[in-house]
Amino acid sequence: MKKNKRLMVMAGGTGGHVFPGLAVAKKLQQQGWEIRWLGTADRMEAELVPKHGIDIDFIKVKGLRGQGIKRLVLAPFQILNAIFQAKAHIKRWQPDAVLGMGGYVSGPGGIAAWLSGIPVVLHEQNAVAGLTNHWLAKIAKKVFQAFPGAFKDAPVVGNPVREDVVALPDPMQRMQDREGAVRILVMGGSQGARILNQTMPQVMAQLGSGFEIRHQAGKGSADEVRLAYQQVGVEHVEVSEFIDDVAAQYAWADLLVCRSGALTVSEVSAAGVGAIFIPFMHKDRQQALNADHLVACGAALMIEQPQLTVDKLAGEIQKLGRDTLLSMALHARAAAQNNADQVVADAIVALTEQK
């Protein structure tokens, strides 16, 4: 009896790494592949991945950026230990390929796979390559990038996006007959965004009536944000810590106000919704660069955090009538690259057939 092929996905830390990995995993599961995950026990993958019916192994590893002298001295030993842990998991399960989607776990996992003779496939979600993927690209059999600029010669394929987001009706079908309050969805990503939690209640108080708000505040912040809206007299607002059915929220919204993490940018485009991006302030402007192409094509506006004020954001929202919002949504949908999960899955299949 022919044995099913096996893929080990290495991804963790944030939804921006984990959800694209799940999208590729689902494509291969549909072709009969067995999937196993490599992650860390204290990050979101530990809880999220098993909910999708995928077994997960853990290694102990942490990032190096911004750490003190003691951590830097110990780092080589900790990395070696993580590589040995990953190698043990790989030896026990014997995957045919590994897929690195970023996060601290991908580094030791990718090196362990390479040392074990297992082909490594990488996908970089951001417009600026993370430190882990920058080094792993040198040993990977295949490298993909979501946006131009992360790597010089890697194919640009977009980000793997959940099928329920891709399957949403066209913006024209959703939005052309809408009337009444403009629907604003505020999203801070899987961790929430303090700047949005602090700013949006004041923005909506300044704008007054005519808007309906749904605000994803992040873990532990919902009560505080709900109170902030109440204190400035804003009604018609729903506040939650996390969004389970993100596709339904995109379908509901006329406008997003959000960070521009890689997955958010790709989902905004796939869904076809206009956005005002407030990029997180990386020193390499990673999130700003992620969103540049949607701003350039008229699908989005961007206010970088140093320039963000209540007056500025309120003014930008006030300018956006329904015709403009529909136009932005259509431009967003037109810019979407929605087959990244299939492209990456096909590359993994092709690599294993060469073995």
Curated annotation (Swiss-Prot):
It catalyses: di-trans,octa-cis-undecaprenyl diphospho-N-acetyl-alpha-D-muramoyl-L-alanyl-D-glutamyl-meso-2,6-diaminopimeloyl-D-alanyl-D-alanine + UDP-N-acetyl-alpha-D-glucosamine = di-trans,octa-cis-undecaprenyl diphospho-[N-acetyl-alpha-D-glucosaminyl-(1->4)]-N-acetyl-alpha-D-muramoyl-L-alanyl-D-glutamyl-meso-2,6-diaminopimeloyl-D-alanyl-D-alanine + UDP + H(+). Pathway: Cell wall biogenesis; peptidoglycan biosynthesis. Its main location: membrane. It comes from the Bacteria. One of its GO terms (biological process) is lipid glycosylation. One of its GO terms (molecular function) is UDP-N-acetyl-D-glucosamine:N-acetylmuramoyl-L-alanyl-D-glutamyl-meso-2,6-diaminopimelyl-D-alanyl-D-alanine-diphosphoundecaprenol 4-beta-N-acetylglucosaminlytransferase activity. Gene3D superfamilies: Glycogen Phosphorylase B (3.40.50.2000). Keywords: Cell cycle, Cell division, Cell inner membrane, Cell membrane, Cell shape, Cell wall biogenesis/degradation, Glycosyltransferase, Membrane, Peptidoglycan synthesis, Transferase. It is a peripheral membrane protein. It is found in: Cell inner membrane. The keyword GTP-binding does not apply. Belongs to the glycosyltransferase 28 family. MurG subfamily. Cell wall formation. Catalyzes the transfer of a GlcNAc subunit on undecaprenyl-pyrophosphoryl-MurNAc-pentapeptide (lipid intermediate I) to form undecaprenyl-pyrophosphoryl-MurNAc-(pentapeptide)GlcNAc (lipid intermediate II). This is UDP-N-acetylglucosamine--N-acetylmuramyl-(pentapeptide) pyrophosphoryl-undecaprenol N-acetylglucosamine transferase. It comes from Vibrio vulnificus (strain YJ016). The gene is murG.
